[in-house]
């Protein structure tokens, strides 16, 4: 998982990337391609 300060470019890396908020942190997840995973912070 990548940890970045801005998720704007990471959410556009793949069509099936989605932004979710869990436990007060913002994540980018991708159920089809697991390597596109990131957390803001």
Swiss-Prot record:
InterPro entries named among the record's database cross-references: Ribosomal_bL36, Ribosomal_bL36_sp, Ribosomal_L36_bact
Pfam families for this protein: Ribosomal_L36 (PF00444)
Entry keyword annotation includes Lipid biosynthesis: no
Keyword field: Ribonucleoprotein, Ribosomal protein
One Gene Ontology cellular component annotation held by this UniProt entry: ribosome
A GO term for molecular function: structural constituent of ribosome
GO biological process, one term: translation
NCBIfam families the UniProt entry points to: PRK00831.1
Family designation: Belongs to the bacterial ribosomal protein bL36 family.
Protein name from the UniProt record: Large ribosomal subunit protein bL36
Originating organism: Orientia tsutsugamushi (strain Boryong) (Rickettsia tsutsugamushi)
Upper lineage: Bacteria, Pseudomonadati, Pseudomonadota, Alphaproteobacteria, Rickettsiales
